[in-house]
Swiss-Prot record:
Its cofactor is Mg(2+). Belongs to the PEP-utilizing enzyme family. It holds the Pfam family PEP-utilizers. It catalyses: L-histidyl-[protein] + phosphoenolpyruvate = N(pros)-phospho-L-histidyl-[protein] + pyruvate. Gene3D superfamilies: Phosphoenolpyruvate-binding domains, Phosphohistidine domain, PtsI, HPr-binding domain. This is Phosphoenolpyruvate-protein phosphotransferase. It comes from Staphylococcus aureus (strain Mu50 / ATCC 700699). The active site is at residues 191, 504.
Length: 572
């Protein structure tokens, strides 16, 4: 008899294969054992650190080939952990001062760090805790002489089952053999979930108990569309899911026919579908999925996973590469959006109680122009290689925009005096992610060239609800009428001044939100490249006039639930 296990759908698709249990190695040791040869124990610890660096470098290089530099940057962070004196020194001191064995010293110190990071109401720091756990486990395995599981050695068709997959586990998965995976813990934003989407393999996380309910070699189905795992399916279930898998692949193939199609409603209104990217390595997916531009080019990758600022030349090459590849299509580059939630040793950013409301993004750039000016110079120099738009993140006041624009114009003049060619067709815009900015959209619209609505932050700032907090996640409501009214206000203000508005938050690619946004008059929908073809098919089947009527009714609703019901009645 088959068994159904429910989890969180982390990556689309259907996988059918036998289970491969990722068995946790025995990393137990005598915590109370004292050592007499202190120097020898320190040397043992140092040797484990070096061996871990060698392994992680190999994994990092493999991840860059399979997943791109953006995802491989996780392992740059792991390597930095192994070089962090604030972590390494206390471990060595514990061995020397307390005669602790290397395994005890390592686990005691890293557990303290993990506990501190996990207690913070900050998703980035919680991810740092996961990084330290992963690195600590690798170092401990070398101290104890125990081999960690190596998913790269799998040479037959399997679905991996485990408590969790660490970033290094996921980076070693071979798509040829690993059909999918399912884990006890994790969420859609965990490292393993993000990487599974990059690898395009079905994944389900957060099942809570799958390792207790599945045996090695069981046949299992991973339904990444609905979050279901079926263990030892019946013949009928097997046939049904084989059909479902074939339909999924057929649908993907059918969607490819829309790659070069226009995005136009049944009543002839055009919309622009653009892609969000994190590095130039994301370009193949952008082109493959028929993006009509790039609506958000995040530039943080240039600053992460390193111990010094990127040079102007490094930045110039990264911007030039994307502009050339897009061949005249619009590329919207967001200037540095970073703050105290990210640990960059060379920036010496202050620790803050709430870094998401603190010294970050445009605030940091205006205050530390030695960071801002090289980025603007690199962007201006790259502007002649394509259609460049520049937008400033987290702008709260018109004076912030004016100051940023003045600095950019100053650097433009400097570059021209140095003999550089600069495009005269660069549009300057802002991210609308703060309610105050949306409230003054009519004021901003007179001075900016465009708006890009960042719904992820706009929603949590408007509803005062941390989207990463389980306790208040019910308040993170993309379809709340208050959000729809703000979006409408921004779009109408831009159109009144002959400007355009895009959206680059998750809402832009959401199938419930798309009819509403179309009706509100959104000009550009920017989303994950893998969502573009589905969105194109959806928009091409909608009537702009009908969606305008829908949107006008939606903004008069009282609750998110009413809005969803309204959309479902309009779009069947």
């Amino acid at each position: 008899m088959s068994k159904l296990i429910k989890g969180i759908a982390a990556s689309d698709g259907v996988a059918i294969a036998k289970a491969y249990l990722l068995v946790e190695p025995d990393l137990t040791f005598d915590k109370n054992e004292k050592v007499t040869d202190v120097e020898g124990e320190v040397a043992k610890f140092n040797s484990a650190i070096e061996a871990s660096k060698v392994e992680l470098t190999k994994i990092r290089n493999n991840a860059e080939v399979q997943l791109g530099a953006d995802k491989a940057a996780i392992f740059d962070a792991h390597l930095l952990v192994l070089d962090d004196p604030e972590l390494i020194q206390p471990i060595q001191d514990k061995i020397k001062n307390e005669n602790a064995n290397a395994a005890t010293a390592l686990t005691d110190v890293t557990t303290q760090f993990v506990t501190i990071f996990e207690s913070m109401d900050n998703e980035y720091m919680k991810e740092r805790a996961a990084d330290i756990r992963d690195v600590s486990k690798r170092v401990l395995s070398h101290i104890l002489g125990v081999e960690l599981p190596n998913p790269s050695m799998i040479d037959e068709s399997v679905v991996i089952v485990g408590n969790d997959l660490t970033p290094s586990d996921t980076a070693q998965l071979n798509k040829e053999f690993v059909q999918g995976f399912a884990t006890n813990i994790g969420g859609r934003t965990s490292h393993s979930a993000i990487m599974s989407r990059s690898l395009e393999i079905p994944a389900i996380v957060g099942t809570k108990s799958i390792t207790q309910e599945v045996k090695q070699g069981d046949i299992i189905i991973v339904d990444g569309l609905n979050g279901d795992v079926i263990v030892n399916p019946t013949e009928d279930e097997l046939i049904a899911y084989q059909d479902k898998r074939e339909c999924y692949f057929a649908d993907k193939k059918e969607l490819q026919k829309l790659r070069d199609a226009d995005t136009v409603t049944v009543d002839g209104v055009h919309a622009e579908l653009a892609a969000n990217i994190g590095t130039p390595n994301d370009l193949p997916g952008v082109i493959e999925n028929g993006a009509q531009g790039i609506g958000l080019y995040r530039t943080e990758f240039l600053y992460m996973g390193r111990d010094q600022m990127p040079t102007e030349e490094e930045q110039f090459e990264a911007y030039k590469e994307v502009l050339e590849a897009m061949d005249g299509k619009r590329v919207v580059v967001r200037t540095l959006d970073i703050g105290g939630d990210k640990e960059l040793s060379y920036l010496n950013l202050p620790e803050e109680m709430n870094p998401f409301l603190g010294y970050r993004a445009i605030r940091l750039c205006l205050a530390q122009q030695d960071i801002f000016r090289p980025q603007l110079r690199a962007l201006l120099r790259a502007s002649v290689y394509g259609k460049l738009n520049i937008m400033f993140p987290m702008v709260a006041t018109i004076n912030e925009f004016r100051e940023a624009k003045a600095i950019l114009l100053e650097e433009k003049e400097n570059l021209k005096n140095e003999g550089h060619d600069i495009s005269d067709d660069i549009e300057l815009g802002i991210m609308v992610e703060i309610p105050a900015t949306a409230a003054l959209a009519d004021v901003f619209a007179k001075e900016v060239d465009f708006f890009s609505i960042g719904t992820n932050d706009l929603i949590q700032y408007t509803l005062a609800a941390d989207r990463m907090s389980e306790r208040v996640s019910y308040l993170y409501q993309p379809y709340n009428p208050s959000i729809l009214r703000l979006v409408k206000q921004v779009i109408e203000a831009s159109h009144k001044e002959g400007k355009w508005t895009g959206m680059c938050g998750e809402m832009a690619g959401d199938e419930t939100a798309i009819p509403l946004l179309l009706g509100l008059g959104l000009d550009e929908f920017s989303m994950s490249a893998t969502s573009i073809l589905k969105a194109r098919r959806q928009i091409n089947g909608l009537s702009k006039n009908e969606m305008t009527e829908l949107a006008n009714r939606a903004v008069d609703c009282a609750t998110q639930e009413e809005v969803i019901e309204l959309v479902n009645n309009y779009v069947k």
